[in-house]
């Protein structure tokens, strides 16, 4: 074992030498005191969690999960094909199909699995398919496209002109699919969705949109950016997550009956794994239903996002300007990014996880701030002041958002 241990040790040491070693923070979240948590016996404010609207602690969602737990027990009992096709997950899929105005939906154990296994399976169903994928697509999309072994073209980030050039190079009668995200999680930029839809129609391509960072948050009923733009019906496959705005766990796709059924019968990431337990499916269904009916959380969320960005501008904190709720602060150095994160936590009681390579390109290391409706004006002010002090201590330049945005945008798409 010592021979192999040496290999693993060298690999870890290399990561440490590059300032990329990840240490997970031990947290005790507080359902009755969101967005606070306990860390090292101290109360902290969380500014980096994906529970965007705090739905994991919503009274309706918690009560629904308690009721389901007492009624059905903890586990699902098996795969969907063998004992695990519980009524709760069927109700969830019906709710998701309705959310996106599609004929059918299919639930997976995570958003990663939904992307990975669906995209790879499309190539099994259509062996001649060609993928067109944005260069900054999520690792789950990259994994699915890569494991499909299908022909692929990677277009420059958000560049529809480059996408069209690539589409033109492929026979119009050959199966093809454009894969993109509605909002990119590390920079917060929105895709030009309607332009991509138009190109798909022009060149006879399917469209696959990842809405994981936008479902629940945008649109009249929480259907994401596609619903906001009133174009859900023009997108062939909408993929999303239950683990962010909806506050639970799991991923899904929605589309027409035949496509969803084909994936159900083909995707190994769906077939060969235990299904979501009823306690989770029921909680997710109630979360979706609530956010279909209530705009209160979305309105408050956008108010906090605006206040946070305004505060950063007032303090000259160099965040990456975008139209979304994701607020990245580019540090550009892995050591300083880690130091800033640790100082925020240990000195100021503020938890913001730093993001380093391989999640983001080298030289674009960052802090990613995630506002929620529960963040107060005082929390925003405390965070802003803490960042100013930390930037001074670490010799990180305060610069205008406009200048930084242009500089980093070039790095992101180079």
From Swiss-Prot:
The modification N6-(pyridoxal phosphate)lysine is found at residue 244. InterPro entries: 4pyrrol_synth_NH2levulA_synth, Aminotrans_II_pyridoxalP_BS, Aminotransferase_I/II_large, AON_synthase_class-II, PyrdxlP-dep_Trfase, PyrdxlP-dep_Trfase_major, PyrdxlP-dep_Trfase_small. It catalyses: succinyl-CoA + glycine + H(+) = 5-aminolevulinate + CO2 + CoA. Transmembrane segments: none annotated. The active site is at 244. It is an enzyme of class 2 (transferase). Its cofactor is pyridoxal 5'-phosphate. Pyridoxal 5'-phosphate binds at residues 185, 213, 241, 273-274. Its EC number is 2.3.1.37. The keyword Acyltransferase applies. Substrate binds at residues 22, 133, 152, 359. GO terms for biological process: protoporphyrinogen IX biosynthetic process. Pathway: Porphyrin-containing compound metabolism; protoporphyrin-IX biosynthesis; 5-aminolevulinate from glycine: step 1/1. One of its GO terms (molecular function) is 5-aminolevulinate synthase activity. The keyword Metal-binding does not apply. Keywords: Acyltransferase, Heme biosynthesis, Pyridoxal phosphate, Transferase. Homodimer. PANTHER family: 2-AMINO-3-KETOBUTYRATE COENZYME A LIGASE, MITOCHONDRIAL, CLASS II AMINOTRANSFERASE/8-AMINO-7-OXONONANOATE SYNTHASE. Belongs to the class-II pyridoxal-phosphate-dependent aminotransferase family. This is 5-aminolevulinate synthase. The lineage of its organism: Bacteria, Pseudomonadati, Pseudomonadota, Alphaproteobacteria, Rickettsiales.
């Amino acid at each position: 074992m010592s021979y192999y241990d040496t290999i693993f040790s060298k690999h870890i040491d290399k990561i440490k030498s590059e300032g990329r070693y990840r240490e997970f923070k031990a947290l005790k979240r507080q359902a009755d005191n969101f967005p606070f948590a306990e860390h090292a016996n101290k109360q902290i404010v969380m500014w980096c969690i994906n529970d965007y609207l705090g739905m994991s602690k919503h009274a309706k969602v918690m009560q629904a999960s308690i009721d389901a737990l007492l009624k059905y027990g903890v586990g699902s009992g098996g795969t969907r094909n063998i004992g695990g096709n519980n009524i709760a997950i069927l109700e969830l899929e019906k709710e998701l199909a309705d959310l996106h105005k599609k004929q059918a939906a299919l639930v997976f154990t995570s958003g990663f699995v939904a992307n990975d296994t669906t995209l790879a399976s499309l190539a099994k169903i259509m062996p001649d398919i060609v993928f067109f994928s944005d260069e900054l697509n999520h690792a789950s999309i990259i994994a699915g496209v890569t494991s499909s072994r299908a022909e692929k073209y990677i277009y420059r980030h958000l560049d529809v002109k480059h996408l069209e050039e690539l589409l033109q190079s492929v026979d119009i009668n050959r199966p093809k699919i454009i894969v993109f995200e509605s909002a990119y999680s590390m920079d917060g930029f929105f895709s030009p969705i309607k332009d991509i839809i138009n190109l798909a129609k022009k060149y006879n391509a399917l469209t696959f949109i990842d809405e994981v960072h936008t479902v629940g948050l945008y649109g009249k009923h929480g259907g994401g950016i596609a619903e906001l733009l009133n174009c859900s019906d023009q997108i062939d496959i909408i993929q999303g997550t239950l683990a962010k705005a909806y506050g639970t766990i799991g991923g899904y796709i929605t589309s027409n009956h035949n496509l969803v059924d084909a994936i159900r019968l083909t995707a190994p990431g769906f077939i060969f794994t235990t299904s979501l337990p009823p306690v989770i499916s029921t909680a997710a269904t109630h979360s979706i239903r609530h956010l279909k009916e209530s705009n209160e959380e979305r309105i408050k969320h956008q108010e906090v996002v605006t206040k946070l960005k305004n505060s950063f501008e007032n303090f000259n904190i160099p965040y990456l300007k975008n139209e979304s709720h994701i607020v990245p602060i580019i540090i550009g150095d892995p050591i300083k990014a880690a130091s800033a994160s640790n100082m925020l936590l240990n000195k100021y009681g503020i938890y913001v996880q730093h993001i380093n390579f391989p999640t983001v390109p080298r030289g674009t290391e960052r802090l990613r701030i995630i506002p929620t409706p529960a963040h107060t004006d005082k929390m925003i002010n405390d965070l802003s002041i803490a960042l100013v002090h930390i930037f001074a201590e670490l010799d990180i330049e305060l610069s205008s958002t406009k200048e930084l945005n242009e500089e980093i945008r070039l790095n992101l798409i180079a």
